[in-house]
């Protein structure tokens, strides 16, 4: 019998039948019929947007759950949606009470902090779960227990930003915030200067008109290249347009946006600008399941009526939509775990809480799920999300389209995932250096770079041509060839411009820079390809590549005139001191030989060997003979005197060894002094320059050489800088050409790089390099500080170095006509001017010998005459006493004959005795 028939017949209705019907309605029917679970959503509306994206995501999630019965097979999820005006907390409270009266298991929304607080207080009083998906201002004494928040904790995001700043090693950071809540969200970064060496400048975006151009102009003037924007994605889209308008969308700027919807913005206009743009992404698009849900969302949104312009890509799911989707799923998972979940109607004015509310709240906090925003778990104490991942994404020009859908294709094409930040483990950058350098042409291909340079032979010169030349064709030189090779490797296009002031770059007393360095600092040029020296002070304001040429400071001076050796050049092989020492040694050896020969008994001999009993002995080594022995050995001629004793032979042998070394050294050195024309320079090193003031010296004004002497702490170089600074008008020159002309025309020495000296001396034989290198340094390609091109330029330079192209380019531009080398001069025939002094010495010796012979003759004659007169007088007296004079002539004659005989006998005796020396 049907139930309708039973009810239609009153006679059949009994008391037992009534109890059976009541049992069926209360117990059997609920178990067989599907259960309905109602949730409530309160969403704020704004002008021109009656339905916000969170409401759409809320409905999308409920529809998805009801279609897929695997999660809630016996339960149908329904919803009640209430719309309120923005900032209307009273209306939010009233609508929340209306929904609680209907019997909802959980309340979602609203978004604004004041409205959230009002709804949260009601849910906390009636013990109904409140689900939040927006950033919430932290409360010091937060006692709310009946809520969860899927939005990442503000403190965790602040730590993530700080970790990224430390990873990029930013020393100066500009923080631009939209409202006061931004300072709370970035408090970890704002407190960083007290713990890290980071300078932070804080600026606020103008409110109301959204015109940030004056602010951006100040940032551009202040060279603020690392900027963190804390703003909504709508404001970010507008700011990016103004950044492009201000010319700040270049590779030297790095912008970081804290909004989690940066990936959803339409950035096609900025992809090829070279700008560095980084942000966080909460959506886990690497999961294929997530990608498919995003594609379904996109298809539904594209079929819907167009929405007002927000800067987002059409159909792109935002983070707030994904969080709302995940929030609905978290409630569904908790309700699935709850058995016989009965939702009762609650009245706000009665303050009677929901009996199952605490249990259901705990089930929600214990739920775990891998949603659109990654793995979701909650802190049971405060209801905040924990252990979440933030993808670190960076804007790129092109990439691999790994996803199947159009939206996912865009995400992979425009954005590159370079790392992950986890709330527990911190930062993990996955974009390794190997990946960065695998294709070094990515960010330089087909990009036009402004190159600043300076006219300096042979690096950059005007090309000689009969036709008018334009652009880069006007120049030639080593640096132009280097630029061409770098362009071939990296694929960039370049525009060469001469530095307006014609200077390399130096810092004045006010800290201001000039020259090419200033061009790079002001970002008027991308590269400085010139003979720009890598120095410490320049490295602090610009970046350099690895050096493409190594060199040092040296002295350029006029080549001294050659001087002939001179007629007495045979004395030059030995210094005057050595000549004096040799003569003293000869005298000393002669005296020692004389003394030893007198002292030793073996140098005395009997002059009459036939008469062994003779007491007369002789010694050949008189003082004159000893000197003659020394001179003969020194002249390599020997003498008739030979030592007999061992002691005298030792003296003679040592003297012979000494003369052997001296004569050999003299002979070996004599040829160079007689055959090679000597170049005598008044200076041989920097020390010689510092010790004198007659020769003026200096360097190029505002160049690295001048800076070297200005900053040097070495006493010699300090003295040289004092000399140059005291004569700045004459010592310092404007450029190298002016300095070279001064070297040629005046008594001036130019301090400059050795490579430039090498080039100049190859083409002007009147100039030469004096001394060695004062220091060691290198030329590098300059870039603005933080430029992404530096590492790529360095890799290309190393490649050219390994291939030998740098050496070939140097040989090409440095090879000149060449000057004859001094060492390669052929020995010419010796003339009178070379060895004429020897003839003078010979003639002087002959003349001297003649005069000495005459002197000896006169001396001997006078000596003999005196002796004869003395003898005659003495023996005349003797004869006169022995034989008195008679008057007869016979007696006188006899007496004279006898006296003459006596005199002759006495002469013979004295002559014989004079032969023997005792």
Curated annotation (Swiss-Prot):
Residues 1-30 form the signal peptide. It comes from the Eukaryota. Keywords: Cell membrane, Disulfide bond, Glycoprotein, Ion channel, Ion transport, Ligand-gated ion channel, Membrane, Phosphoprotein, Postsynaptic cell membrane, Receptor, Signal, Synapse, Transmembrane, Transmembrane helix, Transport. Disulfide bonds join 765-819. The keyword Iron-sulfur does not apply. Its main location: membrane. The keyword Cell division does not apply. Ionotropic glutamate receptor that functions as a cation-permeable ligand-gated ion channel, gated by L-glutamate and the glutamatergic agonist kainic acid. L-glutamate acts as an excitatory neurotransmitter at many synapses in the central nervous system. Binding of the excitatory neurotransmitter L-glutamate induces a conformation change, leading to the opening of the cation channel, and thereby converts the chemical signal to an electrical impulse. The receptor then desensitizes rapidly and enters a transient inactive state, characterized by the presence of bound agonist. Pfam families: ANF_receptor (PF01094), Lig_chan (PF00060), Lig_chan-Glu_bd (PF10613). This is Glutamate receptor ionotropic, kainate 1. The lineage of its organism: Eukaryota, Metazoa, Chordata, Craniata, Vertebrata. The gene is GRIK1. Homotetramer or heterotetramer of pore-forming glutamate receptor subunits. Tetramers may be formed by the dimerization of dimers. Can form functional heteromeric receptors with GRIK4 and GRIK5. Interacts with KLHL17. Residues 31-576, 675-834 are extracellular. Residues 598-653, 856-918 are cytoplasmic. The modification Phosphothreonine is found at residue 761. It is a multi-pass membrane protein. It comes from Macaca fascicularis (Crab-eating macaque). It catalyses: Ca(2+)(in) = Ca(2+)(out). Glycans are attached at residues 68, 74, 276, 379, 428, 439, 446, 561, 766. GO terms for molecular function: glutamate-gated calcium ion channel activity; kainate selective glutamate receptor activity. The postsynaptic actions of Glu are mediated by a variety of receptors that are named according to their selective agonists. This receptor binds domoate > kainate > L-glutamate = quisqualate > CNQX = DNQX > AMPA > dihydrokainate > NMDA.
């Amino acid at each position: 019998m049907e139930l309708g028939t039973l009810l239609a017949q009153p006679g059949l209705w009994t008391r037992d039948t009534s109890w059976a019907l009541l049992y069926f309605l209360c117990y059997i029917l609920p178990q067989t019929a599907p259960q309905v679970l109602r949730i409530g959503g309160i969403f704020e509306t704004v002008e021109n947007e009656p339905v916000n994206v969170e409401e759409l995501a809320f409905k999308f999630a409920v529809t998805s759950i009801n279609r897929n019965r695997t999660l809630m097979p016996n339960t149908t999820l329904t919803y009640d949606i209430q719309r309120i005006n923005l900032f209307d907390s009273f209306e939010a409270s009233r609508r929340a009470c209306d929904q609680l009266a209907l019997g909802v298991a959980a309340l979602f929304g609203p978004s604004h902090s004041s409205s959230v607080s009002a709804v949260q207080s009601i849910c906390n009083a009636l013990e109904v779960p409140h689900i939040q998906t927006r950033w919430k201002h932290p409360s010091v004494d937060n006692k709310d227990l009946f809520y969860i928040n899927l939005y990442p904790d503000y403190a965790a995001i602040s730590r993530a930003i700080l970790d990224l700043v430390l990873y990029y090693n930013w020393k100066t950071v500009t923080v631009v915030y939209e409202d006061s809540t931004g300072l709370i969200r970035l408090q970890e970064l704002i407190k960083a200067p007290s713990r890290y060496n980071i300078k932070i400048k804080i600026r606020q975006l103008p409110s109301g008109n959204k015109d940030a151009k004056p602010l951006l102009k100040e940032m551009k003037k202040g060279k603020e290249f690392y900027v963190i924007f804390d703003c909504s994605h709508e404001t970010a889209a507008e700011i990016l347009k103004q950044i492009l308008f201000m010319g700040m969308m270049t590779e030297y700027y790095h912008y970081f946006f804290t909004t989690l919807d940066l990936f959803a913005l339409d950035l096609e206009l900025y992809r090829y600008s070279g700008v560095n743009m980084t942000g966080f992404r909460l959506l886990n698009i690497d999961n294929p399941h997530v990608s498919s849900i995003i594609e379904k969302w996109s298809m539904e949104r594209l079929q819907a009526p167009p929405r007002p312009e927000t800067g987002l890509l059409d159909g792109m799911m935002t983070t707030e939509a994904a969080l709302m989707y995940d929030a609905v799923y978290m409630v569904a998972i908790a309700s699935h775990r709850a058995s016989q979940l009965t939702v009762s109607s609650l009245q706000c004015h009665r303050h009677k809480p929901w009996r199952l509310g605490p249990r259901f709240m705990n089930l929600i906090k214990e739920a775990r799920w891998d949603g659109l925003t990654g793995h979701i778990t909650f802190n049971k104490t405060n209801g905040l999300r924990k252990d979440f991942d933030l993808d670190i994404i960076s804007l790129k020009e092109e990439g691999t389209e790994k996803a199947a859908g159009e939206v996912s294709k865009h995400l992979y094409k425009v954005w590159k995932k370079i790392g992950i930040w986890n709330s527990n483990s911190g930062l993990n950058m996955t974009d390794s250096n190997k990946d960065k350098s695998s294709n070094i042409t990515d960010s330089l291909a087909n990009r036009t770079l402004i190159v600043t340079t300076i006219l300096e032979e042979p690096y950059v010169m005007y090309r000689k041509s009969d036709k008018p030349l334009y652009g880069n064709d006007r120049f030639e030189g080593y640096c132009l060839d280097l630029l061409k090779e770098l362009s071939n490797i990296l694929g960039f296009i370049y525009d060469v411009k001469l530095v307006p002031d014609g200077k390399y770059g130096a810092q004045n007393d006010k800290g201001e820079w000039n020259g090419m360095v200033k061009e790079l600092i002001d970002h008027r040029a991308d590269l400085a390809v010139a003979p720009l020296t890598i120095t410490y002070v320049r490295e602090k304001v610009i970046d350099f590549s690895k050096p493409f040429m190594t060199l040092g400071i040296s002295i350029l001076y006029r080549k001294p005139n050659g001087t002939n050796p001179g007629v007495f050049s045979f004395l030059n092989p030995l210094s005057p001191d050595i000549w004096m020492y040799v003569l003293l040694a000869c005298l000393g050896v002669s005296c020692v030989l004389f003394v030893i020969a007198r002292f030793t008994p073996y140098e005395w001999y009997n002059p009459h060997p036939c008469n062994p009993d003779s007491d007369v002995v002789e010694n050949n080594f008189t003082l004159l003979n000893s000197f003659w022995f020394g001179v003969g050995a020194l002249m390599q001629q020997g003498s008739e005197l030979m030592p007999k004793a061992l002691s005298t032979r030792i003296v003679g042998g040592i003297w012979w060894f000494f003369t052997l070394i001296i004569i050999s050294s003299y002979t070996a050195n004599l040829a160079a002094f007689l055959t090679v024309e000597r170049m005598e320079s008044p200076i041989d090193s920097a020390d010689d320059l510092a010790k004198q003031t007659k020769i003026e010296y200096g360097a190029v004004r505002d160049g690295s050489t001048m800076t070297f002497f200005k900053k040097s702490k070495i006493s010699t170089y300090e003295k040289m800088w004092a000399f140059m600074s005291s004569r700045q008008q004459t010592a310092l020159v404007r450029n190298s050409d002016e300095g070279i002309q001064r070297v040629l025309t005046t008594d001036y020495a130019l301090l400059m790089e050795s490579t430039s000296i090498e080039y100049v001396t190859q083409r002007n034989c009147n100039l030469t390099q004096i001394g060695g290198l004062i220091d060691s340094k290198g030329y590098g390609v300059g870039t603005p500080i933080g430029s992404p091109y530096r590492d790529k330029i360095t890799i290309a330079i190393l490649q050219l170095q390994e291939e030998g192209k740098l050496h070939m380019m140097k040989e090409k531009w440095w090879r000149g006509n060449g000057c004859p080398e001094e060492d390669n001069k052929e020995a010419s025939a010796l003339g009178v001017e070379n060895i004429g002094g020897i003839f003078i010495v010979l003639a002087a010796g002959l003349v001297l010998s003649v005069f000495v012979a005459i002197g000896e003759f006169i001396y001997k004659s006078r000596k003999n005459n005196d002796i004869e007169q003395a003898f005659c007088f003495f023996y005349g007296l003797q004869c006169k006493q022995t034989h008195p004079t008679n008057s007869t002539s016979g007696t006188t004659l006899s007496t004279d004959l006898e006296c003459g005989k006596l005199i002759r006998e006495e002469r013979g005796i004295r002559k014989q005795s004079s032969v023997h020396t005792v």
